[in-house]
Amino acid sequence: APALPDRRVIDTPYISQVTPVYAPVGCEPTSLLMGLKAKGYAQEVDLRSFLDAMPKHEYDPAQGFAGSPYQPDQSKRTTIYPAKLAEYGRQYGDVADFSGRSVEELQRELLSGNPVVVYVTLWWAEPYYRTYRMGDHEETLLRNNHAVLLCGYDSQTDQYNVADPYN
């Protein structure tokens, strides 16, 4: 395999989840769409079409986006989990679920020119949790969840380029 560069910034078209399409809890699919477009996929797909075509579920983010990306809902864990998001992304291009991979593996992907959707907390704040009704049971889950797209890395400074669809 060829040696990887020390630094790489992936040319990524920025897409906001707030304007012109207002999808205040649609960070995961918005980040994915930026990543797809950065790789040359989904060039003709606009955010609203992408959000509307995404798999949905009444309450279970493992089965589809829980709730609506257009409407905050305190009673629902409004997100879509990585495996289902990656499955959706594969309709448009080469997408992998990198859940549980090491930081070094993520850095290698970035230096290889592959953007990575990462699940973080909103504004990088301390995580906080609440209990959600999940069908016939309850689960305590992260409340201030957010997703952004890593689209660059510098191994000399250990800094990342981040495309945050909310900011």
Regions picked out by a protein language model, each given a short descriptive name:
Residues 1-83, 122, 129-132, 156:
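Active-site-adjacent structural segments surrounding the nucleophilic cysteine of cysteine proteases
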